[in-house]
């Protein structure tokens, strides 16, 4: 009996047929395991245990028994054959992965047709494609897209995604989309081709602020074709064409919506002068009332200016001897007007805070301001505002380049009243044009000259830059009107061009100091050491 129990206790399952804790199943008995044999187990520790037999109750013997946990009751092969098979547990279905977003590859025709592609940051975001033929396609982005995923909140990510939807918007004009610069260049090339501009000017034209010469050539050709024999008053033809080129450049930039930060294309401003409101009262560019100051002019008797003064101003001109004992023509003006900051300065000299405005005859200057006001009222009778404004240039050819440095002398074009000789003899009853009657009733014109003009038979004061810029106030307004006519003949829509209003600034002050100017040098070191 004891030996049988020992056999049962020492019986261990064969290798590959299950572990000691788990009895082999029918699958293990019927077919050998296809898996490789497990690694060899380490040697089992044995312990001594006393076993008592039934026959000899007093006697005891020691037997070596392997140290194993208590085995389950063994089952024979017959019992295994009769025992029912255990049902296998079905493996739980693996969670299906979310389908990957569909990748739709654009066709080669669609890729070639797309000229501009951008993302509209709406909610949900959309992909906007602009085709070369003016076609505009708006496609809602899939929520799996990185752009759409970055804009979604945590609550929105839990919601199911919606299907893509495409909306096709056709350009009603069917015009290809171009940039602002290309739009301006296309209009400029059309004008230069039509009016036969020089090829060099046409090739170098890039719609830059300092490229007025090419547009002035367009205006010059248009004047020769449409307005041959144009009458100008105290205006040079070159200055008139230059101002037309500036106004045309302003219309081109307004048409193309191109702007430059520190450059105004017209170079002009609207000054509310208020010099024709009160009789005998003039105001300078500061907006202050100008003061009376005696002004004495001496000219050589044999000079052209001296002879002209004796003929035209015989009541004021007289021949006297100067301090060197020479005979000169002297004209004394007691009605001269100057800026309030020049009260302590001698004639033709200005302080550092002066605006540089000076009139030798205040009455003639006021007549000129009344003339331009009446001219504006005759030209635009229904205008509610603007009759009291003066269109004045702020740059002559000396300071027309962008980014120029201040130079010695006056920083704004000189404003001088010119009298219309023999205009008093005209019969106003025979003239029906109100714009012409403005000059008959007020026989003087405001003329804009170079900032620091150099007159004939005289030397330049200070050696500053000078040019032959000269245009009257009515002709400056006519230049703007003619540019509008030129534009209307070539384009259907006239863009809105705004001339800024003049405001006094310290940059317009008279400069008595000449600042050194540097010239660019390509060398890295100034000296050869």
From Swiss-Prot:
* A family per Pfam: Viral_DNA_bi
Q: What is its main location?
A: host cell
Residue positions where Phosphotyrosine is found in the record: 195
Provide this UniProt record's keywords sorted from A to Z.
Answer: DNA replication, DNA-binding, Early protein, Host nucleus, Host-virus interaction, Metal-binding, Phosphoprotein, Viral DNA replication, Zinc
Q: Where in the cell is it found?
A: Host nucleus
Biological process terms in GO annotation: DNA replication; DNA-templated transcription; positive regulation of DNA replication; viral DNA genome replication; viral DNA strand displacement replication
Signal peptide residues on this chain, from the entry's feature table: none
Write out the biased-composition intervals (Basic and acidic residues).
1-17
Annotated spans, C-terminal arm, DBP binding: 513-529
- Annotated residues for binding of Zn(2+) 2: 396, 398, 450, 467
Q: Name one GO molecular function term.
A: identical protein binding
Question: What ranges does the record give for the region Disordered, renumbered to this chain?
Answer: 1-107, 125-166
Q: Name one GO cellular component term.
A: viral capsid
Biased region (Basic residues) positions are 129-139
**Composition bias, kind Acidic residues: at what positions?**
155-165
Q: Which residues bind Zn(2+) 1?
A: 284, 286, 339, 355
Q: Where in this protein does the record put region Flexible loop?
A: 297-331
What function does this protein fulfil? Plays a role in the elongation phase of viral strand displacement replication by unwinding the template in an ATP-independent fashion, employing its capacity to form multimers. Also enhances the rate of initiation. Released from template upon second strand synthesis. Assembles in complex with viral pTP, viral pol, host NFIA and host POU2F1/OCT1 on viral origin of replication. Covers the whole ssDNA genome during synthesis. The complementary strand synthesis induces its relese from DNA template. May inhibit cellular transcription mediated by the interaction between host SRCAP and CBP.
What's this protein's family per the entry?
Belongs to the adenoviridae E2A DNA-binding protein family.
Subunit structure and binding partners? Homomultimerizes on viral ssDNA bound to pTP. Forms a initiation complex with viral polymerase, pTP and hosts NFIA and POU2F1/OCT1. Interacts with host SRCAP.
> What is said about the domains?
The C-terminal arm bridges DBP molecules together, thereby creating a chain.
Which protein are we looking at? DNA-binding protein
Source taxonomy: Viruses, Varidnaviria, Bamfordvirae, Preplasmiviricota, Tectiliviricetes
Identify the coding gene.
Answer: DBP
